[in-house]
Amino acid sequence: LWSAFVIESNQQRIYIGGDSGYDTHFKEIGSRFKSFDLVILDSGQYHDQWKDIHMVPEETVKAAIDLNAKKLFAVHWAKFTMAHHPWYEPVERIIKAAETIDLPYFTAMIGEVLEWDKKAKGDHWWKKL
């Protein structure tokens, strides 16, 4: 875990994670803060040699579970290409893993305004490009 932030108000709590490999720190943070209304986690630009700094999509969903997330917004997957996977692969794997456990998720397009306190949405915008 390189850096992360918890933003908390009287009504809501958000976790913003930076680049991170999957490990026990997510469960520790989830235990400390009980739950998060939204977690923003990296998913993309992964490779076996980068496992300590970038999670694969299924690990991102597992981290969201460990954090007791009510909604997941996976980021770090659609703007730059550093890894050899197709650029849309991370989000499609996120969707599959999140839907398997009924975890609400967002798939906002770059530059799109996200109203995260509303119902989560999973528009497949990349398929329309």
Label the predicted regions.
Residues 1-34, 110-129:
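Core dinuclear metal-dependent hydrolase active-site scaffold
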Residues 13, 21-110:
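Cap/insert and terminal regions of metallo-dependent hydrolase folds
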